[in-house]
């Protein structure tokens, strides 16, 4: 660990890891500070993400995907419901522990500490 860095990223979740990866790829020194002992544990929020949104940043790995989302059904308290089938874009339910950890490894391999 160095005494100084060009960038300090607070939080090693997906956003922090992606920020650290981009900074490291740009040739700057970066340190990620994470309060939890293990990246991706505990999971902080939902596991759903769209394929196009994720693919803009990184190609999804098969071991990240718990399930593929092809439709959504929303039901209101009064039982009114809306159902949508995704014809062009699908999404994923992610294994967040694996996903978060892998993103932190990508950042580390690019030079983030």
Regions found by a protein language model. Name each.
Residues 1-15, 31:
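Beta1/beta-strand and adjacent pyrophosphate-binding region of the FAD-binding site
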Residues 4, 36-58:
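Conserved N-terminal glycine-rich FAD pyrophosphate-binding loop of Rossmann-like flavoproteins
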Residues 12, 22, 26, 38, ...:
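Predominantly flavin-linked oxidoreductase catalytic cores and closely associated redox partners
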Residues 17-18, 48:
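Short alpha-helical segment within the catalytic ATP-binding CA
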Residues 56-72:
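A short alpha-helix-loop-beta-strand transition element characteristic
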Residues 68, 74-113:
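Conserved N-terminal helical subregion
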């Amino acid at each position: 660990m160095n005494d100084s860095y060009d960038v300090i990223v607070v939080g090693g979740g997906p956003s922090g890891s992606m920020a650290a990866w981009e900074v490291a790829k740009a040739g700057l020194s970066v340190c990620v500070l994470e309060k939890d002992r293990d990246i991706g544990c505990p999971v902080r929020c939902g596991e759903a993400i769209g394929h196009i949104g994720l693919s803009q940043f990184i190609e999804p790995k098969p071991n990240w995907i718990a399930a593929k989302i092809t439709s959504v059904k929303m039901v209101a308290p009064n039982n009114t419901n809306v159902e949508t089938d995704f014809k062009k874009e699908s999404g994923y339910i992610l294994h967040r522990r694996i996903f978060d950890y892998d993103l932190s490894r990508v950042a580390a391999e690019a030079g983030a500490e």
